[in-house]
A protein has these predicted regions:
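Pseudouridine synthases involved in rRNA/tRNA modification
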Residues: 1-36, 201-202, 215-218, 228-232, ...
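Short, surface-exposed secondary-structure edge patches
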Residues: 50-54, 224, 261
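Short coil-to-beta-strand transition motifs
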Residues: 75-78, 200-209, 263-264
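RNA pseudouridine synthases
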Residues: 1-180, 188-191, 289-293
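Well-ordered beta-strand positions
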Residues: 84-85, 136, 188, 212-215, ...
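Short Pro/Gly-enriched beta-strand edge/turn motifs at strand-loop
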Residues: 63-66, 192-195, 206, 249-255
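Conserved hydrophobic positions within beta-strands
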Residues: 83, 172, 210-213, 246
């Protein structure tokens, strides 16, 4: 996928080398190496330049990203997609429950990656699948996809610095006590399982979840959760640890009376745009299967 980004050089960047300026914009060393291999990827005032060239106030720096290949081993499959937002750099999707993010041995043609590969193949565009905030197969809600190597790198760095804010909604049985708080409990694998996690204060990695009850209806509580860290199954294990596991969670609480998947939805996503640096915020309402529990 091709993308052209232009920067007007201000006094603050006067005298910097091009590579220094790009590093200040969030480009990684790997990004700069990748750009060097692309033909005419760096132009200053319309003329090709080396990365070590100096910039002056008023210069126009043009970065031309050229990615002509698609992700291998992701067959394009026409699948329903709820695209909330799209521009030249990112894509925000409201993923349904039951759809994996990536293809796997048992889910080779029903993943979000398959659907997006079809979406771009139909447009005649190459596409490399780069998902920034991954969701479990049975967790619904918002996820952001980077459309090229620069936005991917910047979003990944933002995620590592906890600058991508995610808020979830979950449903549990009963009245949660206390109704708000912070769960600070490290997580580790359960035995030899590659999937299941548990609270483990001796061997676990630090995990922090902030929660607050939003409403109580029909014997259940709707809980808002904000992640400070992003461990595997963090919300699911932390709520179990609190004594209020998510309903429908086959792994940690197989309570399938009202729903047949964990009642967990990524409803709000906010971050600074990786290229324009504008604040972005997206929301996705609670899906019907979760709403029905509260009726």
């Amino acid at each position: 996928m091709d993308r052209t980004i232009k920067y007007q050089i201000t006094e603050e960047a006067d005298g910097l080398r091009i590579e220094q300026f790009l590093r200040h914009q969030g480009y990684s060393y790997q990004n700069i190496t990748q750009l060097k291999k692309m033909p005419e990827s760096i132009l200053k005032n319309g003329v090709w330049e080396y990365m070590r060239s100096l910039l002056a106030t008023g210069d126009i720096l043009t970065v031309h990203i050229q990615e002509n290949e698609s992700s291998p081993n992701i067959p394009p499959v026409e699948l329903p997609l709820s695209i909330i937002y799209e521009d030249e750099d990112i894509l925000v999707v409201n993923k349904p429950a039951g759809m994996p993010i990536h293809p796997s041995l048992n889910n080779y043609e029903n993943s979000l990656a398959n659907g997006l590969m079809w979406y771009y193949t139909e447009q005649g565009k190459p596409f490399i699948f780069r998902c920034t905030n991954r969701l479990d197969r049975d967790t619904s809600g918002l996820t952001v996809i980077a459309k090229h190597l620069i936005s991917s790198s910047i979003l990944s760095s933002m995620g590592a610095r906890h600058e991508i804010k995610r808020e979830y909604l979950a449903i549990v049985r009963g009245s949660v006590t206390p109704p708000s708080g912070t769960i600070d409990a490290p997580l580790a694998r359960t035995g030899s399982s590659m999937i299941e996690r548990k609270v483990d204060f001796k061997h676990g990695e630090r995990a922090v979840t902030h929660y607050k009850v939003v409403e109580e209806k029909n014997g259940h509580s709707l809980v808002s959760l904000i992640l400070e860290t992003g461990r595997t199954h963090q919300i699911r294990v932390h709520m179990q640890y609190l004594g209020f596991p998510l309903v429908g969670d086959y792994l940690y609480n197989p309570d399938m009376e009202y729903i047949h998947r964990q009642a967990l939805h990524s409803w709000k996503l906010s971050f600074i745009h990786p290229i324009t640096r504008e604040p972005m915020e997206f929301t996705a309402e609670l899906p019907k299967d979760m709403k029905n529990i509260l009726i």
